[in-house]
């Protein structure tokens, strides 16, 4: 499906437990039109319109939803889909979607889930069959939003979670923050960290004292982003943080 064999073999050697797609700020976009939509990355590659992303270049979305699910199947790993819940990137001047726009995004999520999990007699399952995969791929995780937070996120998160869980109760729901503190259900919280080398070294015990009765933790992104990032010193700082994660997994 268009991916370099040598890179996929290295990925396979890592034996990943799951793959997150697409993840990152491409999910949020920088405008209502650039917010991620499943339908834009479905169907034949040559029919996908692509999108300008917030890093300043155009994504063809040639690696789309089908290719991602096929890669997960080939690697024998679980799939995690990340959807937009009606918010653009909050770091870059957020735009909040209105009611009809939120519903359109929620409908888009259901189309994606049907593509991954529906029978070939369904609308999106039939497209999957025409793309060469008659049987459902399956999907284990759904992450609602990317790096979103605050009351606006919590409201949208709960709307998506409730609707999806009613139809697909088997899906494991991932939140961007600890929404349980606002009284909302979740299975896993996705924590992202970008900081100095020293912060990562000093926080090697970050997870030693987490409440084991709370939600699971998924560190979806972390990196040193301050100072000279191309040094052994930086690598050791990140490694110290990783040791803490491994110790608590």
Regions flagged by a language model, labelled:
Residues 27-65, 92-107, 114, 118-143:
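Aromatic- and acidic-residue-enriched carbohydrate-binding clefts of CAZyme catalytic domains
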Residues 15, 19, 72, 112, ...:
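Conserved, mostly hydrophobic/aromatic
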Residues 90-97, 104, 133-136, 178-204:
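Substrate-binding cleft/loops of secretory-pathway carbohydrate-active enzymes
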Residues 1-13, 102:
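Extended acidic/polar, glycine-enriched regions
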Residues 5, 62-68, 116-134, 175-180, ...:
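Alpha-helical scaffolding within the catalytic cores
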Residues 20-31, 83-87, 177-179:
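Short, solvent-exposed turn/loop segments enriched in Gly/Ser/Thr/Pro and often Arg
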Residues 163-176, 188-249:
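Catalytic-core region of carbohydrate-active enzymes that cleave or remodel glycosidic bonds
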Residues 15-17, 75-79, 135-140, 169-172, ...:
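Short, well-ordered coil/turn segments that N-cap beta-strands
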